[in-house]
Amino acid sequence: MDRESAIELVRGLVAIPSLSRQESAASAWLVEQMRGAGYDRAYVDEAGNAVGELGDAHASRTIVLLGHIDTVPGNIPVRIENDLLYGRGSVDAKGPLATFVAGAARFGSAAAKAAGLHVVVVGAVEEEAATSKGARFIAKRFNGTNAPAPGACIIGEPSHWNRITLGYKGRLLLDFTADQPMAHTAGPDASVASVVVDFWNWVTAHAAKANEGKDKVFDQLSPSLRRFITSANEEIHDVVDAQFAWRLPVGFDAEQFMTELRTVASGFSRTTFDLKFRGYEKPWKGDRNNALVRSFLAGLRTVDASEKLGFVLKTGTSDMNVVGPVWHCPIVAYGPGDSSLDHTPNEHLSVDEYWKAVNVIEETLIAWSA
C-alpha cells in the first residue's frame, strides 16, 4: 500500500460516521479495504469488529493490533487542509486504526507466512462506551483455548508517531440515588443534598490520604464528580441522582474500596443510598524491557534514525485495560496524533505524521518477525 492509498484509507474511514453501537457501516467498509489490500482473511465478527488477518491462523506466533472503530459524537466536516486531516475520529482513533491496517498490509501476507507469524488487525466496537464489547470479545477469542493467545499486542491510540504508551490508569464508576423524607429547610436535619456533599467530601479526603507521598498523577487515585441532580418524588422524598468516578492507580484494591463506600453510605441514618458500581477496568502498566518494545525501537530507527522513542503513561483508560490482564503478554499502545485533540471540535491528524506511523508499524512487524 503506497502513501496515496494509505491516505485514502484513513480519509475514507473517518468519513463514515461510527458512533459507539453504530459501527456496522464503517466495519463493513474497512473489511472490504482489507480484502483489497491483500489480507488473507477479512470479516466482521460476531461482536461487530472489523477483523483482518495475515498468515496462517495456526502459526506459531500471533500478534494482535487492536484499534477501535467507534467514535464519540461530533460532526466535523471531513477535509484535508495544509497536511491536516480534519474529522471526528481522525485522532481518536481511526487514524491509529488505519495506521495498523496500512502498516500490516505493507508488511504483507508473504512475510507473515515466511516468518510463521499470524497478524491480526482489529477495529473494535464500543471502546468509547464503558462496555468495550469488541475488545472483550477478542480477549475471549484469543484465550489459548479458542485460539492461540497472542505473543504481543499493540493498542491503537494516539501518542504521536515517535512515542509508545506503556500503561493506563484503571476506572470505576458509581451511579447512585440518595433519598430521605422531606423536611422543612429551617429544621435541624441536613438536606439530602448536604448528605451527598458530605459523602463526596469523604471521597476526596480518602483520595488525599491515599495519595500522600505520590507525586505522579499516574500513581494517584483521582476522583471526579460527574453528575449531581436534586429532585422530589411522589413519595414526598427529596432525592439526589449522582455519579462519582475514579481513575485508579496500579495496585489499587477496588473491591475493598467499594466495600468502604457501601459502609460510609449506610452510615447516614435518615438517608437511603442505592449504589450501583459499573465500568470497572483494572489499571495496567506494561514492561519496557521486552521484544515488542525493542521491535518498536528498531522500527523507529529504520524510519528515522535521528528520532528517539518516547515512553508515556496515560491517566485515562483504553482497551489495554481489557486485554492486558487477560493475555499478560508484551503490550503497548501506539498511533499517530495528538491526544489532546481527542473528542474536541478541532480534531485533526497530520497526514505526514500518519504516513510515518504507517512505516513504523511495517518496520516494527519486520523486526518482530525476525
Q: Residues of each region from the PLM?
A:
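Buried hydrophobic packing segments
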Residues: 30, 97-107, 135-138, 196-199, ...
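Short, surface-exposed alpha-helical segments at coil->helix boundaries
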Residues: 7, 24-28, 97, 258-262, ...
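Short, conserved micro-motifs enriched in small and acidic residues
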Residues: 85-98, 105, 190-193, 348-355
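Metal-dependent amide/peptide-bond hydrolase catalytic core
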Residues: 159, 172-370
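Acidic/His- and Gly-rich active-site-bordering loop/insert found
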Residues: 1-90, 108-116, 328
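Acidic/histidine-rich catalytic neighborhood of metal-dependent amide-processing enzymes
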Residues: 98-171, 369-370
